[in-house]
A protein has these predicted regions:
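C-terminal secondary-structure termini that scaffold catalytic or DNA-interacting sites
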Residues: 419-435
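Flexible interdomain linker/hinge and immediately adjacent N-terminus
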Residues: 150-197
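Short, basic (Lys/Arg/His-rich) helix/loop patches that form interaction surfaces
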Residues: 331-390
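N-terminal core-binding DNA-recognition domain of tyrosine recombinases/integrases
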Residues: 52-168
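Short, charged phosphate-coordinating catalytic segments
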Residues: 144-149, 218-252
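Basic, alpha-helical nucleic-acid-contacting "clamp/cap" segments
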Residues: 250-319, 339
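Catalytic-site neighborhood detector that most strongly recognizes the C-terminal catalytic loop/helix
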Residues: 392-417
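Basic, Lys/Arg- and aromatic-enriched nucleic-acid-binding interface segment
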Residues: 196-226
Length: 435
């Protein structure tokens, strides 16, 4: 097909895009499938390309997990395809993905690294490296499948390098044979710092003004769950199996485990509620078990006051009695911060509260701040890299390493908190908010 754009005829204006759909098995296990499609100028799908088959690491294996979905990679691939075939196909003199050469890829990677984002910034180094890795793997998979039909070869795409592992052992690895030049920017990343004293106010405030998500805040702040994972938590009575389990010894709860090992269908309308980044059974950090139990008991009382689909028994319910979606959870958290926490801090006589409240007018505080707060507490409790990775539910140690690198600053600026949260919940919550 001729990919040259005809801007006067939207039906002939084609663009590569990602299309995703969520399915579920008869036993309720939910999974996502993503495709690379061609859409016309009206946004309608005109063709499924099958190119997604060459994006994943399972392309050449005999077994692939049901939940394996290359969606994040497909956005990088579509960006490259649109640049090569849609935007510059005429200049390059190509009409098919097989015609892409290494010099064309080099141009694209440099263009991606230098491109200014809508917010005025530039792609981070890690994002550029991810783009190069994904696109290189995609082209290598095509070359492996179709051989000489593809102009670029695997030998052109990769170079062998010997690296030294942390164990001291030498290992040969195949590294993408590209180097992109980008604009380096000092960035503090998203605003996410939250002083311990602010958390002590946020918890009782959530119970009063946002009881439907207060326990979700606890799951993030005391068990390190991501917002999308929170929405996948089930009640103890779920027919899929208890979403939360307790280990009690001598009348005392010693361990609490949150089951986010699988995504299940939790709504009768099949609407997606959120995704689990790492499927696992996540424990509540021991120091926070007491406050977590208090929050859980309050949430169970709340659930008795609302209607929900008993067949699915979701832990979090929206105003329609359906499992709460990530987007709804995010909006409710934002409203809690903007409508209640921020005004309370700005009006405080405590200078630290007033300064932080002003910062909330200048920066958006998202749900990721809760997981960041949790991680800071782990660092202050002297957890090592393995401990951070375990309690955070990370796939790689990269994030843990970054926190440990900044440990000195964290110790100086923040403080450990645990028992004071219980006190804040019972005393501040009772006296200040009449809970």
């Amino acid at each position: 097909m001729d990919m040259e754009q005809n801007y006067l005829d939207p039906e002939r204006t084609m663009k590569y895009a990602v299309f995703s759909i969520r399915n579920s098995l008869e036993n309720g296990i939910s999974y996502r499938r993503s495709f690379i499609v061609l859409k016309n100028g009206y946004g309608m799908i005109v063709r499924f390309t099958r190119l997604e088959d060459y994006a994943g690491i399972y392309s050449w294996r005999t077994y692939k997990p049901l939940q394996a979905d290359p969606e994040p990679k497909l956005y990088f691939i579509c960006g490259m395809l649109n640049y090569m075939l849609v935007e510059n196909g005429k200049r390059f003199g190509i009409r098919h993905v097989f015609d892409i050469t290494k010099p064309m890829l080099e141009e694209y990677f440099n263009s991606y690294a230098m491109a200014e984002k809508p917010d005025g910034g530039y792609h981070k180094e890690s994002t550029v490296e991810k783009c190069i890795s994904v696109v290189t793997q995609f082209m290598a998979n095509l070359s492996r499948k179709f051989g000489g039909y593809v102009k670029v070869t695997r030998d052109e795409l990769y170079v062998e390098k010997t690296i030294r592992l942390h164990t001291g052992k030498l290992e040969i690895r195949h590294i993408p044979n590209f180097q992109a030049t980008g604009v380096f920017e000092e960035s503090d990343g998203p605003f996410r710092d939250m002083p311990a004293k602010v958390m002590e106010i946020l918890i009782p405030m959530a119970i009063k003004y946002a009881p439907d998500i207060a326990f979700g805040i606890a799951l993030q702040a005391f068990a390190g769950l991501r917002a999308g994972e929170v929405c996948n938590v089930r009640q103890e009575c779920s027919h899929y199996g208890a979403g939360i389990r307790f280990v009690e010894i001598g009348g005392t709860v010693r361990r609490i485990e949150i089951d986010v090992s699988r995504e299940y269908k939790l709504r009768s309308d099949d609407t997606e509620i959120g995704s689990i980044k790492k499927h696992r059974k996540q424990g509540v950090y021991p120091d926070f078990i007491k406050i977590f139990l208090e929050m859980y008991e309050r949430h169970k009382k709340y659930l008795k006051t609302v209607d929900y689909e008993e067949e699915f028994a979701p832990m979090f319910v929206n105003s329609n009695g359906l499992a709460m979606s990530y987007e709804t959870y995010r909006r409710k958290f934002k409203a809690l911060i903007n409508d209640h926490l921020r005004p309370r801090l700005v009006e405080s006589t405590d200078p630290e509260f007033r300064i932080y409240g002003q910062m909330l007018y200048e920066n958006d505080l998202g749900t990721h701040a809760l997981r960041h707060w949790f991680t800071v507490q782990l660092v202050l409790r002297k957890e090592d890299m393995a401990g951070l990775k375990f309690w955070r539910g990370d796939k790689s140690p990269e994030s843990a390493f970054q926190y440990l690198q900044n440990k000195g600053d964290l110790v100086r600026e923040l403080e450990i908190t645990a028992d004071r949260l219980v006190t804040a919940l019972l005393e501040i919550g009772g006296e200040m908010y009449g809970l």
